[in-house]
UniProtKB/Swiss-Prot annotation:
Binding site for ATP: 541-599
Cofactor(s), names only, from the UniProt record: Mg(2+); Mn(2+)
Protein's recorded name: Glutathione biosynthesis bifunctional protein GshAB
Described purpose of this protein according to its UniProt entry: Synthesizes glutathione from L-glutamate and L-cysteine via gamma-L-glutamyl-L-cysteine.
Region (Glutamate--cysteine ligase): 1-347
Cofactor, how bound (note): Binds 2 magnesium or manganese ions per subunit.
Family classification: In the N-terminal section; belongs to the glutamate--cysteine ligase type 1 family. Type 2 subfamily.
Reaction catalyzed: L-cysteine + L-glutamate + ATP = gamma-L-glutamyl-L-cysteine + ADP + phosphate + H(+); gamma-L-glutamyl-L-cysteine + glycine + ATP = glutathione + ADP + phosphate + H(+)
Record InterPro entries: ATP-grasp (IPR011761), Gln_synth/guanido_kin_cat_dom (IPR014746), Glu_cys_ligase (IPR007370), Glut_biosynth (IPR006335), Glut_cys_ligase (IPR006334), GshAB_ATP-grasp (IPR040657), PRibGlycinamid_synth_ATP-grasp (IPR020561)
Length: 769
């Protein structure tokens, strides 16, 4: 078969691609390492309805399922995002990073997963497992690696090497069966290289290979994976299926079901399964539709990786499957599954001692010799078909190092750390570290960092609910959400089907906004609008002794705004006009309302969040210049540009320069220690301001005003900016200065100070109510 790829550049490229999907199980635990007995987090909805986040056997055993992707990078990003979403939504709990369980309660207290109805088939199946195998063994967790070759690759090979009168599906079945056969023979190598469950609590399992660790936990003396050993999660007795043909494979499983050995194909706990995408997953469905992908079930959770698996491990497994496709039939044992099982168990229980294996002729061969034989073949086909790919060769070299030096295996490293720290403490420390890493980047959707932060937030919240998300226009932050037959189109997180087009036009035009609000007795600042800069300049005498705001007529985010609270010159006024007219063809000059500016986020006639916005500022230290202080403050990892992070970097543009000049300062001025220097008069977070949550503290009086303003304009998702007087006695002197039809949500979700609000959830509730 190798020659087919050497002769065809297109097939060579396709060989190293594929379709990938991952399923990962983690147990939810309390902060002291005990099985969490809380229900599955409600935000994820019914398990039957969420395609991404379900439970495995136990209510406490969460399962994350990626969609099928076309690269290892993208499937890894999906898994990372799901892990982060689940971690952040599992309040006061952690995700246990090991395949072997945490501290467990009595068998009868381990909760089986709950479903919509007590007689759900999923519930009944789990009750069957609990009765047949016990609950504790069901809590062994791991990763399932789903893979299929590109259809174009199958087509190309079918044209070249199919048998006479062989249908394409029969050919496809034969190829996948061949890969599965290679996997079954050589899976011991995969367990040696990826196994990560050699340690466990003493009351969970006992084998003749046990040794006690200092904390009282147990370890396989030279073992690699309890989960993949005979003491792990296996069928009650060995089930050998016939890999010589697809029909024989189907017949084998059917016979075991008819004999009552297993209830259904779901209970066939083979390390690799042939599957199709039909949801019933019955043997009859597989027989009818044929093989569509392979499911590898023997991958342990790697406690040394926050995601439970590394990209290199994913890439190596892919190479392992490619090797199966390229293998010659003579390389495969003639259906000697018992020998393959013995090799698997031997490595799982004794792999670090590198015991001798049995080859197809039942002769002993060293682990190193057998492993290097396969790894060298992988290296050879990479060199032959993809010589420029040094990364893949490096992955193979890493596996060789583990083979030659057992102490470098994942299992050996885990055992060493557990011996040092203790079983529970090590895994808890890992879980806490991973949680801290997740929390530090909680605002982020991996792989969507180029999109606005508010878009990333609502996308993550949609995933949590099992809502399908399609990116329609990445540059425009335009998404489609689908839950069942319900479809919603959303742009920039808050432009939705609930918007009234005329309402948007009114809010876009600040003059119209003020007129309409004033007509409904809602207080707004008085002022004039100008479309001619010369006429606006001539009006200087009307404003020179007043506190004023100069701003563009139709912009958001505080761009182009200048505020004069103190005496200003004609030159200052002219510069403010220059700035405002650079953003719009018309500007507004209006009275300045004293007080503090607050953003009220109103969704469907309810104030969901209130934010106090502090203008962009720096605090002096008596040493550094204003410019240097700005540069230092901008190094905060939570500050970015273009709404990609919770806070915006402070700019050093004309608006900030003007603000400094109004204070008789420049960028080279050195403020005194603890002296606060404001770089902006307007307090928009979008221009570098700081955000402080005030939702609970805000007087309901002003919340009602915000709601009334949105009702006047028939705005359903709206940011209302209100100047609130500092003295309660003056509250009637408030004023609405702006209504925003596309309010940013990220500043409420991740404020500089105060409680984080789940605004994405609120918008999704509104859209899918």
């Amino acid at each position: 078969m190798l020659d087919s790829f050497k002769e065809d550049p297109k097939l060579r490229k396709l060989l190293f691609s594929g379709h990938f999907g991952l399923e990962k199980e983690n147990i939810r635990v309390t902060s002291d390492g005990k099985l969490a007995l809380t229900p599955h987090p409600a935000i994820f909805g019914p398990k039957e309805d969420n395609p991404y986040i379900k439970t495995d056997f136990s209510e406490s055993q969460i399962e994350m399922i990626t969609p099928v992707t076309d690269s290892i990078d993208s499937v890894y990003e999906w898994l990372e995002n799901l892990h982060n979403i689940v971690s952040l939504r599992s309040e006061n709990e952690l995700l246990w990073p090991s395949s072997n369980p945490p501290i467990l309660p009595a068998e009868e207290d381990i909760p089986i997963a709950e479903y919509k109805t007590p007689d759900s088939p999923d519930r009944k199946y789990r009750e069957h497992l609990a009765k047949g195998y016990g609950k504790k063994i069901q809590l062994l967790s791991g990763i399932h690696y789903n893979f299929s070759f590109p259809e174009a690759l199958i087509d190309g090979l079918y044209d070249k090497i199919s048998l006479p009168e062989e249908s394409k599906q029969d050919f496809k079945n034969r190829l996948y069966l061949k890969v599965a056969k290679y996997f079954m023979k050589n899976r011991w190598l995969l367990i040696y290289l990826t196994g990560a469950s050699p340690v466990y609590l003493a009351d969970f399992s006992k084998t003749k290979h046990d040794e006690s660790l200092p904390d009282g936990s147990s370890a396989l003396r030279d073992g690699i994976s309890l989960r993949n050993s005979n003491a792990g999660y296996k069928n009650k007795e060995a089930l050998y299926v016939d890999y010589n043909s697809f029909d024989a494979y189907i017949s084998s499983i059917s016979n075991y079901i008819e004999a009552g050995k297993i209830e259904s194909m779901r209970e066939f706990y083979n390390p690799i399964r042939l599957k199709n995408a039909h949801t019933d997953q019955t043997v009859e469905s597989l027989a009818e539709h044929g093989v569509e992908y392979l499911e590898i079930r023997s991958i342990d959770l790697n406690p040394l990786e926050s995601n439970g698996i590394s990209k290199d491990e994913l890439a190596f497994i892919h190479l392992f499957l490619i090797k199966g496709l390229l293998s010659e039939d003579r390389e495969l044992c003639s259906n000697n599954q018992q020998l393959a099982d013995e090799n698997e168990n031997n490595i799982a229980l004794n792999g670090l001692a590198q015991p001798a294996l049995k080859n197809c002729d039942n002769e002993e061969i060293s682990v190193v010799e057998a492993g290097l034989l396969e790894l060298n073949k992988m290296s050879d086909f990479i060199q032959s078909l993809r010589p420029e790919d040094t990364k893949l060769q490096a992955i193979i070299e890493k596996q060789k190092e583990r083979l030659l030096h057992p102490e470098k295996t994942i299992a050996a490293q885990v055992k060493q750390q557990v011996t040092k720290e203790g079983y529970v403490d090590f895994h808890l420390n890992q879980a806490k570290t991973y949680m801290e890493e997740t929390e530090a980047l909680a605002y982020k959707l991996i792989g969507a960092e180029d999109m606005e932060l508010s878009t990333q937030i609502i996308w993550k919240d949609a995933i949590a609910r099992g809502i399908k998300v399609d990116v329609l226009d990445r540059a425009e932050n335009f998404l489609r959400f689908q839950k069942g037959d319900h479809v919603e189109y959303v742009k920039q997180a808050s432009k939705t089907s609930k918007d009234n087009y005329v309402s948007v036009l009114m809010m876009e035009n600040k003059v119209v906004t003020k007129l309409v609000l004033a007509e409904h007795d809602i207080r707004v600042p008085f002022g004039d609008s100008f479309s001619d800069q010369a006429l606006a300049l001539e009006a200087f005498s009307l404003f020179e002794d007043k506190q004023i705001v100069v701003k563009p007529k139709s912009t958001n985010y505080g761009w182009g705004i200048s505020i004069f609270k103190n005496k200003f010159t004609l030159e200052d006024y002219q510069e403010a006009l220059n700035i405002a007219f650079s953003y719009d063809s018309s500007v507004i000059i209006e009275e300045f309302i004293p007080g503090d500016e607050f953003r009220f986020l109103v969704i469907n006639d309810k104030v969901e969040a209130v934010l106090k916005r502090v203008p962009a500022n720096v605090t002096g230290d008596g040493i550094h210049t204003v410019r240097e202080l700005v540069e230092e403050k901008n190094t905060d990892p939570l500050r970015g540009t273009d709404h990609l992070k919770p806070l915006e970097k402070i700019r050093t543009g004309p608006e900030e320069t003007l603000m400094l000049s109004m204070q008789n300062l420049s960028w080279d001025s050195i403020p005194k220690a603890e002296e606060i220097i404001y770089l902006r008069e307007n307090s928009n977070v979008s221009t570098g301001g700081d955000s402080i949550d005030y939702t609970e503290e805000m007087d309901d009086y002003f919340k009602e005003i915000a709601i009334r303003a949105t009702q006047v304009l028939d705005a359903k998702i709206c940011g209302v900016d209100i100047i609130v007087p500092r003295e309660t006695i003056d509250r009637d002197k408030h004023a609405i200065i702006e209504l925003n039809f596309n309010p940013a949500m990220h500043m409420h979700c991740f404020p500089y100070q105060g409680e984080k609000k789940k605004i994405g959830d609120k918008i999704l509730d509104f859209l899918f109510e």
